């Protein structure tokens, strides 16, 4: 399992805080949970349309995790029809955020993945950013190539922070949503599946999630693959997957978890493509900013939303 380590998760939402150090300890804990750690690699799965103008929190989190002022970021715009334009936009953004070096790997053909210069870039960079576009195009260019093997190896070794937005998010699982409909009753024809790049093989990711009414198609995908976990990510929202198995939500929207662990029945194997699916005992979580979910333990930790002000008595006015 690529994200499991022996190091325990530090933040405990139910930890008892002694009154004499209430403010100091709460502030320290919240700062630790909300401040990106420049030396701590992760996989950032972004629902698309991330903020590029105002706070840019998701992109800043990526740069911080990739090394902050020492970050060497490689942009892979292979999913896009206009890779030079899209890549150039992200170069400007990451340079403005203080990254030490930013470059584009404009890979349009599979043969390029064997280029020694591309290999050297991927061996030395600290962050890889997969842009949006068409997830089938991205997989067609990168899947089962030396370049992709190298990225996957370095991500699993904790040597590289990886981020993908929109189509770049869709490819994260082994099973990938390649297309389909939206806003309909779950049914087999609602979702088209393909093989992804398998960075987080346990999940099936859908993006632009509530913005494009994609709950039905994610449920349809999970019903066909009940050994996986469904992750639906809204626009300008990111699921940060840590190497210890926890994911944390960053951004303005929500992350929807569709968990079939306790599923007791579905008619999926027996109905035609357009017939409604029934799915019994499916578990659902809606996570927002700061909430955490453990990929393997299936446990949830709520966010610490606000510190009490200095005028509040201990325990009052905390939400």
Question: Could you describe each region identified by the protein language model?
Answer:
Residues 24-69, 81-96, 101, 177-319:
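C-terminal and late-domain segments of enzyme folds
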Residues 121-127, 136-161, 284, 289, ...:
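Mature, structured domains of secreted/extracytosolic soluble proteins
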Residues 80-124, 130, 137:
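Portal/gating segments that form or line small-molecule/metal binding sites
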Residues 74-78:
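Short internal beta-strands
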Residues 131, 137-215:
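Class I SAM-dependent methyltransferase SAM-binding "motif I" and its flanking Rossmann-like core
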Residues 4, 11-18:
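Acidic, Ala/Val/Gly-enriched low-complexity intrinsically disordered segments
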Residues 45, 103-105, 129-130, 162-165, ...:
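General beta-strand structural signal in soluble alpha/beta enzymes
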Residues 8, 19, 25:
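Cationic, low-complexity basic patches in intrinsically disordered or flexible, solvent-exposed regions
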């Amino acid at each position: 399992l690529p994200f499991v380590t022996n190091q325990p998760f530090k933040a405990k939402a139910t930890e008892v805080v002694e009154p004499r150090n209430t403010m100091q300890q709460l502030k320290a804990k919240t700062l630790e949970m909300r401040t990106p750690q420049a030396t701590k690699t992760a996989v950032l799965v972004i629902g698309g349309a991330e903020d590029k103008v105002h706070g840019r929190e998701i992109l800043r989190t990526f740069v911080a995790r990739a090394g902050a002022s020492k970050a060497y970021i490689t942009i892979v715009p292979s999913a896009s029809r206009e890779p030079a334009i899209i890549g150039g936009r992200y170069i400007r953004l990451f340079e403005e955020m203080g990254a030490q070096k930013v470059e584009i790997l404009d890979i349009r053909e599979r043969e390029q993945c064997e280029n020694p210069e591309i290999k050297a870039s991927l061996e030395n960079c600290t962050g890889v950013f997969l842009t949006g576009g068409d997830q089938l195009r991205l997989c067609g260019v990168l899947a089962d190539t030396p370049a992709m093997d190298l990225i996957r190896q370095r991500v699993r070794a904790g040597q590289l922070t990886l981020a993908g937005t929109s189509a770049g998010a869709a490819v994260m699982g082994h099973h990938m949503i390649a297309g389909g409909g939206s806003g309909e009753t779950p049914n087999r024809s609602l979702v088209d599946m393909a093989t992804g790049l398998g960075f987080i093989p346990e999940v099936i990711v859908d993006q632009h999630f509530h913005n494009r009414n994609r709950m039905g198609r994610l449920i349809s995908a999970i019903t066909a693959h009940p050994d996986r976990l469904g992750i639906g990510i809204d626009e300008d929202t990111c699921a940060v997957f840590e190497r210890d198995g926890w994911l944390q939500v960053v951004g303005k929207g929500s992350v929807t978890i569709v968990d079939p662990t306790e599923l007791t029945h579905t008619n999926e194997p027996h109905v035609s493509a357009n017939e409604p699916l029934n799915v019994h005992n499916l578990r659902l979580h809606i996570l927002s900013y700061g909430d955490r979910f453990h990929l393997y333990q299936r446990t949830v930790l709520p966010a610490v939303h606000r510190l009490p002000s200095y005028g509040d008595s201990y325990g009052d006015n905390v939400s």
